[in-house]
Amino acid sequence: MLRSLVCFAVLAAFTLPCRGDQTVPPAETVIRLTVQPMAAPKPALRYLLLPELKEMNPGNPIHGYLRCFSEQQGFFYNKEACERRDKLQSLPLKELLAQELQDYGKIALRQADWAARLDKPDWQILLKLKTDGVSLLLPDVQEMRSLANALKVRFRAEVALGRFDDALRTAKTMFALSRHMSEHPTLIGGLVGVAITLIAIGPLEEMLEQPGCPNLYWALTNLPNPLISLDKGMEGERVLIAGEFRDLNDSAPMSEDQLQKLIAHIDKVREVEKIEQKPGLPDRSTRTWLDARIKDEGLVSAARRRLVEVGHPEERLLRFPAEQVLLLDEMRAFEVGRDEVMKLTNLPTWQAETLAGQIKPAKKEALFGFLVPALLKVRNAQGRLEQRIALLRHVEALRLYAAEHDGKLPVTLSEIPVPLPLDPFTGKPFRYQVDGATAHLRGTPPPGWEKSPGHNIHYEVIIQK
């Protein structure tokens, strides 16, 4: 599948709730958990959610993951097997025939366990990223989601059987797989990493409800934050764009033939825009865009002046065709807009969201402006995962508190003795209230997403005495 199509497909998936209660109004996703009081394990880090160094071996996990599919092709690709797996992922835990599924996937998923504990992830795709650009095919990335779905079934079976050590081994495999996705030099890799983590969180929540489940507060606390880094993907986007427009010459005048080839290539790149366009919109071909501007000497002169301001020699620009000047200026504008978003990536989520809201959207007539909003959506997805993990830390903190207070819930979060993370989208404590025997934990949606159920996560936690 083309990189651009994969990106939109993955982003669309994040509009769906994750193990929420569908009987409530669609304004929020309610996740109801009935849990037991449970003190922290001794030693505190007995349970972790990523493989420890002592479990690791030298090697490239990516090759290991892909080998899973060659071990059992029918298991992954057979239509009946896929349909059964879809059902097993959503079947109520008590209806799961766990005994039959405890070695689900057999050698293929045991191979995934091995791969997740190799120490040097390398997707070996950088050269193709430079040459193929937006046409880059990403079948390996999509297959990782299939692998995660299969691991989820085994995870659920282990939870249903009360085999917590085995279940946490599978959780480690899934969390490691998601982290390895962030080593992929595309934002799609990071998005799939977020998606895989959310796939793992469903069975993890089910495990918390099982009698005797160990408390995972410190396991969740010791996860890297952010769990899925976007650094490699953001760098890859810069490489990709530079490769796509390498024929846009800024050092010498371009011939008519060179310009025509470049314009045709730009139209190919902009095909991604048509995915979101509504029928009936006017022609937005690059040629049409240029023809509307090259006759206006004022526009061309202004473009040339902006290029001079960023360091291009004016005497050289005066020898360039008007189309070349306009395209160079449009690329300059795109890079400025792109970096206004990219520079926010490693800020705390609430700061990034606040500053992103102040960014002026690209002008409707901008040739490449459509590429920038996707960056904001990817950062938003990363923040939502951060919020979900932080909420789970709160759930486990409630279990810690209840274990020390005869099964009672705290009236306020300030009564909890362990550190609690702030809501990533506000930089403030999560919303919390107690209604009888039920604690309500709510995350605040990012600005503009107040009516989206997938952005309004509400945990209802009942402590079982």
Model-derived regions, located:
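Bacterial N-terminal signal peptides
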Residues: 5-15
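Short acidic linear motifs
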Residues: 8, 18-465
